[in-house]
Amino acid sequence: MFPAMLNVGLGLRRGLLPELLAMEAGAVDFLECAPENWIAVGGAYGKGLAQLAERFAVTCHGLSLSLGGSAPLDRHFLEQTRQFLDRYQVRLYSEHLSYCSDDGHLYDLMPIPFTDEAVRHVAARIRQAQEQLERRIAVENISYYAAPYQAMSELDFIQAVLEEADCDLLLDVNNVYVNACNHGYDAQQFLAGLPQARVAGMHVAGHYDEAPDLKVDTHGAAVKEDVWALYASACARFGVQPTVLERDFNYPPLAELLAETARMRAVQCAAGGQADE
């Protein structure tokens, strides 16, 4: 029986699979995977996913739907994703508010111009994806370094997309911090401007300090203190939401990752959340 509340999660990465398979039930509430990396996987990896899904709830965070792209949405991939989400009874599916294809795959998450036209374009694609997937999507605020054309602020753009598409938000707290440092806005004010009812989950991760005014979202290090503080503010404003610790490389021993998820749970409890028994 999975916990009724999915409070604390860890990103499912193939490099962590042996340790995750040996992890005690209850160490985290759920695991988050990218469906693209697992849909067609068999062998030891496929067996490992099936074993983990019997012990932990699964959520999904997509990588390649390219909601902001110009090419038509890949309906075959959407159908594969829908079947994957149904098979593993996925409660939360999210995708990046970005594009990653332009006459071919770009292998990166590119920011969308902050314009009214882009709002209408991406919102229509989100609605189409939600219809085919037969569930709501939460879109994630991304980190970006070269700002796209901006007829409105990032905050106004996100607000408009959420309203026009009638979708949810996966709030990446580290990305808010990174963008605030890099583009000179106040992270707390950014959180205060987001619609509370739309936040369906959160991410926390580590970043690299290139300079005081240049942070790089790497997912390759421990979560920094400023991000923990911002996460506490996010929990205070939006309540306890399913939160994933993302770590994509430079994997430490699993015990170190679980120490971070334990801290995540402590922050949630301080904000009024309750740990599942």
Swiss-Prot record:
Domain of life, source organism: Bacteria
Protein name, entry field: UPF0276 protein PP_2398
Xref: PANTHER family: UPF0276 PROTEIN HI_1600 (PTHR42194:SF1)
Residues passing through the membrane, by range: none
Family affiliation: Belongs to the UPF0276 family.
InterPro entries: MbnB/TglH/ChrH (IPR007801), Xyl_isomerase-like_sf (IPR036237)
